[in-house]
């Protein structure tokens, strides 16, 4: 690996960590605006996911994908993906946040341990091979789409008192 490649790899890892943290915080700010824990479990229809379900799915995905990231298949036998979509309506905000933080801690721990040279390593997800860099980008895309769902649903539920998470559109 050349010096330039090493710097580029370091920069990539730093930017990914920074942007993942940014979307994590965005979701947490949206969740914080929910008036009560019951709203975490609201579904728009029978096929939709609640914020609680998305949180549990993200946590389960992160624990599976980022545990032994370079050495084991990203779909761990211990993961019960279907159960992630059946988050009990009795789960409190505190319980959900504990699971949420556990997933993110696993992700950031694995990401922090990577070196630029690791980015070209081959990793597997459900038996399919990817470069580590490609797997990271795919996971970022997955997480960003689900964070968007969390923000959308929180804004929908709290529309009357919603505080914009970015630059608010003009009000007439």
Predicted regions and their residues:
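Hydrophobic alpha-helical core bundles mediating ligand binding, dimerization, or RNAP-core interactions
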Residues: 16, 20, 24, 31, ...
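Short, flexible helix-adjacent loops and helix caps
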Residues: 32-39, 116-119, 123-124
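Acidic/histidine-rich alpha-helical segments that form the ligand environment
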Residues: 85-123, 133-143
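Short, contiguous alpha-helical
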Residues: 2-3, 17-28, 37-84, 125-172
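Active-site rim elements
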Residues: 9-17, 90-97
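Terminal targeting/low-complexity segments that flank the catalytic cores of oxidoreductases
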Residues: 1-9
């Amino acid at each position: 690996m050349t010096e330039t490649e090493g710097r580029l790899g370091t920069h990539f890892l730093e930017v990914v960590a920074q942007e993942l943290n940014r979307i994590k915080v965005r979701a947490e700010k949206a969740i914080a605006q929910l008036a009560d824990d019951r709203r975490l479990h609201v579904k728009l229809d029978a096929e939709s996911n609640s914020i609680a379900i998305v949180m549990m799915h993200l946590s389960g995905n992160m624990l599976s994908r980022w545990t032994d990231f370079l050495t084991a298949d990203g779909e761990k036998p211990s993961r019960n993906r279907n159960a992630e979509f059946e988050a009990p309506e009795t789960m409190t905000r505190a319980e959900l946040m504990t699971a949420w933080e556990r997933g993110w801690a696993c992700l950031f721990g694995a990401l922090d341990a990577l070196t630029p040279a690791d980015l070209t390593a081959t990793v597997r997800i459900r038996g399919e091979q990817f470069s580590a860099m490609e797997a990271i980008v795919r996971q970022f895309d997955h997480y960003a789409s689900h964070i968007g769902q969390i923000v959308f649903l929180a804004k929908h539920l709290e529309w009357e008192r919603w505080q914009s998470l970015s630059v608010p559109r003009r009000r007439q």
